[in-house]
Design a protein with these regions (language model features):
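Alpha-helical scaffold elements adjacent to nucleotide-binding pockets in ATP/GTP-utilizing enzyme cores
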Residues: 29, 100, 295-298, 376, ...
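Conserved beta-strand segments of alpha/beta enzyme cores
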Residues: 107, 268-270, 362
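Switch I (G2) and immediately adjacent beta-strands of P-loop GTPase domains
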Residues: 51-64, 68-72, 252-280, 301
């Protein structure tokens, strides 16, 4: 394959920037750019040892002084001869070094091409390749740890274990189909059934992590609802750490949904500040209220706010208005927290409504001004969305979940066929379908267009 080059670090002023090379002509391209200060020839540079020297353009112009390091195919990221040039992190300098590499014969790397070559050369499977981009995009420490575990094979290992077991089953049934006169079926039926049951349990457990994994990767869609002036926008601003939403003493300031991300208790929340839920003749406010209700339908978690400074001691009409959002949350079927806001203003007598509703996961008194109660809010959210234990990896994307689901369905069908006494070829067909689904997951049997789509998500240089 042709030798490729790209800038591997962010193109903004920094102490260090890196240009990567990979391919058969890596040493030749590097020799055209880099002159070791020791006088040693680039071809003689030892692997995995940093060497100081000059970095020059094709016409000999000094571009920078920096370090070069070479990697053998056996010990490189891509599985090919590779090298890195470490220079000062000026975008201008990095661009000139990259252009010099092109002048020496290297080609511009496509997005994700380094990782794609690692996959093609057997350094990574597809689950590990996907973990690379997940690690780059991680927005919380927990999502970064999950991606790191997946990159180290935490998802690959149980999938490979199931795949190997299924291969053993299919080999047994091929023997039965190919040699029908041999007494093989009865000897292996009970063991085969146990094997399929073990595979079913493993795949079911993996698929069961998808709901949590999806939330871990994309964040918890969290609707903040309440009556007008209940403190919704103030809470949003306090959680994100800056004034994202306009806050005034005028009820109905927020007329549309406002979205922002925040990490609360180590959990990524996609916060949706909604318009106050109330009856109104104003057309714009009506649209805002409808969007608020839609946000509740789409949410994973609901934060229902009640003005804790007045509670339900207001007029009957106002009390009904304040209760409406709580009723919506309680009847949504979603996990919800009742937040009694404005605790810094006192009050709060007779706050909690005595209604025959599904109780909230927690009732928390808090202040968006003093941050009183925020520790309790973080603890409640962490209880709802606990961190994965140990080095296990959660399934985090729809491609992985779909492949596991199809494999699980086929394993169950094979087990049912075996228990029903159906012919070996029927069982074999289902087992092979499960193998193919798992092969797509790891990349053994993945289509070229699907593989290309995965690597299109990567940045250039990775």
């Amino acid at each position: 394959m042709e030798t490729i080059a790209a800038i591997a670090t962010a193109q903004s002023p920094s102490a260090i920037g890196i240009v990567r090379l990979s391919g058969e002509e890596t040493r030749r391209v590097l020799a055209a750019l880099f002159t070791p200060a020791s006088g040693m020839a680039v071809e003689a540079l030892p692997y995995r040892r940093m060497t100081y020297g000059d970095i020059r353009s094709a016409d000999g112009t000094l571009l920078d002084r920096g370090m070069a390091v070479c990697f053998s195919a056996a010990h490189s990221y891509t599985g090919e001869e590779s090298a890195e040039l470490h220079c000062h992190g000026s975008p201008v300098v990095l661009s000139e070094v990259l252009q010099a590499a092109f002048a020496a014969g290297a080609q511009q790397a496509r997005p994700g091409e380094f990782t794609q070559r690692a996959f093609l050369n057997g350094k990574l499977d597809l689950t590990e390749a996907e973990a690379v981009i997940d690690l780059i995009d991680a927005e919380t420490a927990e999502s970064a740890r999950n991606a790191a575990a997946q990159l180290s094979g935490a998802l690959r290992r149980p999938i490979e274990s199931v795949y190997d077991k299924l291969l053993d089953v299919s080999s047994r049934f091929y023997a039965v189909v190919d040699y029908p006169d041999e007494d093989i079926e009865d000897l292996s039926r009970e063991e085969t059934e146990r094997t399929l049951l073990c595979c079913e349990e493993t795949l079911s457990d993996l698929l069961g992590t998808f709901a949590r994994g999806k939330v871990l990767k994309n964040g918890v869609a969290t609707a903040i609802i309440g009556a007008p002036n209940a403190g919704k926008s103030s809470l949003l601003n306090a959680l994100v750490g800056f004034d994202r939403a306009i806050v005034t003493d005028i009820a109905g300031t927020t007329r549309d949904t406002v979205e922002e991300k925040a990490t609360v208790g180590g959990v990524l929340l996609r916060l949706i500040d909604t318009a106050g839920l109330h009856e109104t003749d104003d057309l714009v406010e009506q649209l805002g209220v409808e969007r608020s209700k839609k946000a509740v339908e789409d949410a994973d978690l609901i934060l229902a706010l009640l003005d804790g400074s007045t509670g339900l001691s207001a007029s009957e009409a106002r009390a009904a208005e304040m209760l409406a959002p709580l009723e919506l949350a309680a009847k949504s079927g979603k996990p919800w927290l009742l937040l009694l806001t404005k605790s810094d203003l006192g009050g709060g007598a007779g706050i909690v409504p005595d209604k025959d509703w599904r109780t909230p996961e927690a009732i928390i008194s808090l202040s968006s001004v003093t941050h009183e109660g925020f520790d309790a809010l973080e603890a409640a959210i962490r209880t709802l969305y606990p961190a994965p234990k140990g080095d296990t990896s959660l399934v985090t994307n729809a491609r992985q979940a779909d492949a596991i689901r199809r494999a699980l369905d086929s394993v169950r069908a094979a087990k049912d066929a075996l228990q029903s006494g159906m012919t070996p070829d029927v069982v074999l067909t289902e087992v092979e379908q499960a193998e193919n689904a798992l092969g797509e997951l790891t990349g053994r049997t993945a289509r070229e267009d699907m593989v290309a789509r995965i690597f299109e998500r990567f940045c250039v240089g990775k």
